[in-house]
């Protein structure tokens, strides 16, 4: 088979996988809207209560699951290229913790209860600060994979310590907000909160279109510059985009870990690392994973609803350990 035929075959495989993932997402979305404490049949007319349940509760929650999953997966894929580390992930590297810490600071320092817009801005600033710290240390100190993970874990522990301190100075309402962020949950998502989504979606689409630029960056800064990439400008734009996505995701659903690690890594293993296809596929796969996880979170127990962050950690942590062992064996 000639080179152009191989390339055409690979592109056809990417597109077929993208269509399959989209179909799976649509099926899971339909299932998501039907199942719950009250089953909504697609073959019968809905009562006024069922219609309100569908439109005001399940539909905004479904949209939240999809946009958060897509944002985290695409952020993880981009961060892995930016840091040159396949184990990079917003939750593991402490960036999500930085976003939650900034939201806690806003919660306690502002004289009134912050609006979703204020929480979103605080989360974006927190994510940006922690991303800059991590990228700056990685570049200045030439950190290895293990050391970069340790720095990320340390940043996460630091932010977690401050958030834990906040427990002891919070009233009942603030305590519920803190628990919501720490465990990761979209149970409180409503259309009012989707102002955050209006900010997130354009950035997500823009980042998904940066695949060719990321492919050039993977060749190294020198080769990327020779191919016409303004490396410095592109790097800062990517950092800002990642911070906005992570900040919005944390503001909407709290800290949800491992989506940005597991999804891009498994897709790279299965289909290769061509980012112009990997990024859109990561978005659909991340959305699919979070919708699937939230279905289980809502239905696994009869008496209670599990936090979404617990479900993604249960799925992602064993895969992360396997990836660490595999990375060690490769070296």
Swiss-Prot record:
Any one GO CC term of this protein is:
plasma membrane
Which parts form a coiled-coil structure per UniProt?
none
| Gene3D superfamilies to which the protein is assigned, alphabetical | ABC transporter involved in vitamin B12 uptake, BtuC
Q: Which PANTHER family match?
A: FERRIC ENTEROBACTIN TRANSPORT SYSTEM PERMEASE PROTEIN (PTHR30472), VITAMIN B12 IMPORT SYSTEM PERMEASE PROTEIN BTUC (PTHR30472:SF29)
An individual GO BP term: cobalamin transport
What is this entry's stated membrane topology? Answer: Multi-pass membrane protein
What is the protein name stated in its UniProt record?
Vitamin B12 import system permease protein BtuC
Role description: Part of the ABC transporter complex BtuCDF involved in vitamin B12 import. Involved in the translocation of the substrate across the membrane.
Query: Where found, per UniProt?
Result: Cell inner membrane
Instruction: Identify the coding gene.
Output: btuC
What family does this chain come from, according to its entry?
A: Belongs to the binding-protein-dependent transport system permease family. FecCD subfamily.
Q: What is the first-listed, main subcellular location in coarse terms? A: membrane
Transmembrane residue ranges = 20-42, 62-84, 91-113, 117-136, 148-170, 190-209, 240-262, 277-296, 303-325
Quaternary structure, per UniProt, is: The complex is composed of two ATP-binding proteins (BtuD), two transmembrane proteins (BtuC) and a solute-binding protein (BtuF).
Pfam families in alphabetical order:
FecCD
GO molecular function ontology, one term from the record: vitamin transmembrane transporter activity
Going by the UniProt record, its keywords in alphabetical order are: Cell inner membrane, Cell membrane, Membrane, Transmembrane, Transmembrane helix, Transport
């Amino acid at each position: 088979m000639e080179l152009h035929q191989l390339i055409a075959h690979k592109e056809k495989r990417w597109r077929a996988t993208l269509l399959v993932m989209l179909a799976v997402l649509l099926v899971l979305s339909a299932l998501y809207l039907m199942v719950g404490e009250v089953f909504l049949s697609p073959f019968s007319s809905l009562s006024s209560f069922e219609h309100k349940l569908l439109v005001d509760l399940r539909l905004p929650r479904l949209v939240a699951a999809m946009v958060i999953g897509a944002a985290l997966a695409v952020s993880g894929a981009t961060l892995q290229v930016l840091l040159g580390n396949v184990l990079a992930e917003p939750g593991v590297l402490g960036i999500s913790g930085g976003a939650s810490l900034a939201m806690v600071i806003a919660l306690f320092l502002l004289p009134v209860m912050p609006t979703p817009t204020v929480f979103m801005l605080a989360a974006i600033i927190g994510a940006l600060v922690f991303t800059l710290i991590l990228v700056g240390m990685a570049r200045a100190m030439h950190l290895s994979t293990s050391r970069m993970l340790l720095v990320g874990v340390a940043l996460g522990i630091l932010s977690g310590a401050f958030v834990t301190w906040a427990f002891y100075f919070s009233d009942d309402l603030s305590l519920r907000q803190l628990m919501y962020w720490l465990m990761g949950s979209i149970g409180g998502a409503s259309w009012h909160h989707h102002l955050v989504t209006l900010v997130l979606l354009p950035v997500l689409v823009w980042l998904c279109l940066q695949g060719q630029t990321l492919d050039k960056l993977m060749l190294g800064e020198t080769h990327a510059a020779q191919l016409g990439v303004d490396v410095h400008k592109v790097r800062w734009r990517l950092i800002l985009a990642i911070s906005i996505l992570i900040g919005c995701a944390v503001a909407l659903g709290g800290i949800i870990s491992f989506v940005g690690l597991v999804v891009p890594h498994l897709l790279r293993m299965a289909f290769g690392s061509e980012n112009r296809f990997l990024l859109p596929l990561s978005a659909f796969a991340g959305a699919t994973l979070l919708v699937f996880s939230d279905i289980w979170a809502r239905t696994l127990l009869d008496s209670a609803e599990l936090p979404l962050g617990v479900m993604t950690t249960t799925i992602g942590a064993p895969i992360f350990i396997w990836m660490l062992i595999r990375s060690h064996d490769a070296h």
